[in-house]
Amino acid sequence: MTAHVTSGTGTLTAHMLEHVVLTMALAPLLVLVGKRLLRFLPTRVARLLVRLGSPPLGWTAFAAVTLATHFTGFYDYAVDHEWAHMLEHTLYLLTAVWFWWPVLGRRWRWSVPYLLAAMPVQAVVGVVLLSSDRLLYEHYRSLADQHRAGALMWFTSSLVMAAALVWAAWDWLRAEERRAVAREVYGR
């Protein structure tokens, strides 16, 4: 996924597409597959992985990596240094899996507020790129490209998170309905 950057012919929009695919497509898919694979792990390992999936830590790590890589000199550095670029992608994927785990990896009653709190983080980066009247990264020379990259990040991350939000709200409502029926039928 890094050839366009190292060749010097890439666009920020293409680079942003890589990030969106890693965090908003690949990571959720890995979580959906991963939760099914947990049953094949030794019980202790599976429990440890579930415990490490702390929602506040996952949210914080994902937000911190997103903001730090886009609003510090790290982004320019990563474009010029392949090892840093690979580290950047690894951090995006790992923190995104960590972020998505509470929402997709198990039923969690706080999924709706968790997603609502995460949406602005992605939106801020997208809006800053979209609305800036100056180039934010040395490697890229087109303000129009930067604006497209910002729109791509803002729109796609908002769309994916909104879809996840609808799913989480629906799942929560179904669970509440089941609990209400159980209370009515069994007096619990």
Q: What is each residue range found by the language model?
A:
Residues 1-188:
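Alpha-helical membrane segments of multi-pass proteins
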